[in-house]
Amino acid sequence: MSQKVRIALDAMGGDFGASVVVPGAAISLTRHPDSEFLLFGDSALINKQLDLHPALQKVSRVFHTDIAVSMHDKPSQALRRGRKVSSMWLAIEAVKKGEADVAVSAGNTGALMAMARFCLRTLPGIDRPAIAAIWPTIRGDSVVLDLGATIGGDAEHLKALAVMGSAMASVLFDLERPTVGLLNIGVEEIKGGEEIRAAAELLREMNSPQFEFIGFVEGDGIGKGAADVIVSEGFSGNIALKAAEGTARQISEYLKAAMSRTWRSKIGYLFAREAFRSLRDKMDPNKSNGGVFLGLNGVVVKSHGGTSADGFAYAVDVGYDMVRYDLLNKINQTLNRGGGALGGTPTAREAVS
């Protein structure tokens, strides 16, 4: 495929704005030279960074706005103040207008979700979008969702997540019928609240040809790779994500302290440093950065707000991959196959609450 992938960036999003977004885009460009970028934000700050990255500068267009969404803005505040004028909105709107294939932002998650829903709308049959990400496991990678887009959710919502997540896994992992599990406090059918047990019953009744529902998965099953797709409502999913990232950093610090404690451990490290580097790379949260907003009429990727340039580059990579894999069309095909994979699910809400 020779066509360029057009990536819209909220250059003012996150804790560090253009000082991370632009270098991150430059790193991603080295891996995907068929990318081009639309950068939205303060042109003076953006151009200052672009001057340091001439290769990126050649394939970038800058669109000025001095209005940025704060990391502390409530979604309703962000919509009132930033609709049609903020760097976040303009990046998303570029996707709606067909000027970009994907939007990437490290900004406020709630504001980004609200703006994306308001601007792009949801797919038919999808009531609320979800944040999905690739989760490294001991048996490969899994798709995990929802990682914080929506707090709570009824059985129909969890069913929709399973359908979208399975479509994503099918595309990314080349699986004909990925396995799907519901995150729960136990694997027994009697465990969990009413909604999750009702969702399990719906998924069993579906007997979908597009995925295999394997039942409940406990928290430790995520890292074990118990299923190709792990489904959770956003509150529990976000806690699981942050706990895993914190644990990875904790183990890294423990290893660093242990390897520098005595001269013997330092010598041992010299012999085993390649193995430790491999472990560090595998556990680096930056390499799992980039959550995809599933269920929208467009592709939007959320980066961690406090990430580094390397971390933001991985989020841009995710956006690039979603376009190259034609994820949006594949999800649409899955939802529409056989008269609608979500048969009976109400159509999307037209407004953001």
From Swiss-Prot:
Subcellular location: Cytoplasm
GO molecular-function terms, A-Z: phosphate:acyl-[acyl carrier protein] acyltransferase activity
EC number, as in UniProt: 2.3.1.274
Disulfide bonds: none
Alphabetical UniProt keywords: Cytoplasm, Lipid biosynthesis, Lipid metabolism, Phospholipid biosynthesis, Phospholipid metabolism, Transferase
InterPro entries: FA_synthesis, Phospholipid_synth_PlsX-like
Keyword Ribonucleoprotein applies: no
UniProt keyword annotation of Cytoplasm present: yes
Listed GO biological process terms: fatty acid biosynthetic process; phospholipid biosynthetic process
Known catalytic reactions: a fatty acyl-[ACP] + phosphate = an acyl phosphate + holo-[ACP]
Pathways involved: Lipid metabolism; phospholipid metabolism
GO cellular component, one term: cytoplasm
Quaternary assembly: Homodimer. Probably interacts with PlsY.
Task of the protein: Catalyzes the reversible formation of acyl-phosphate (acyl-PO(4)) from acyl-[acyl-carrier-protein] (acyl-ACP). This enzyme utilizes acyl-ACP as fatty acyl donor, but not acyl-CoA.
HAMAP family membership: PlsX
Family under the similarity heading: Belongs to the PlsX family.
NCBIfam families named among the record's database cross-references: plsX
PANTHER family in alphabetical order: FATTY ACID/PHOSPHOLIPID SYNTHESIS PROTEIN PLSX, PHOSPHATE ACYLTRANSFERASE
Protein name: Phosphate acyltransferase
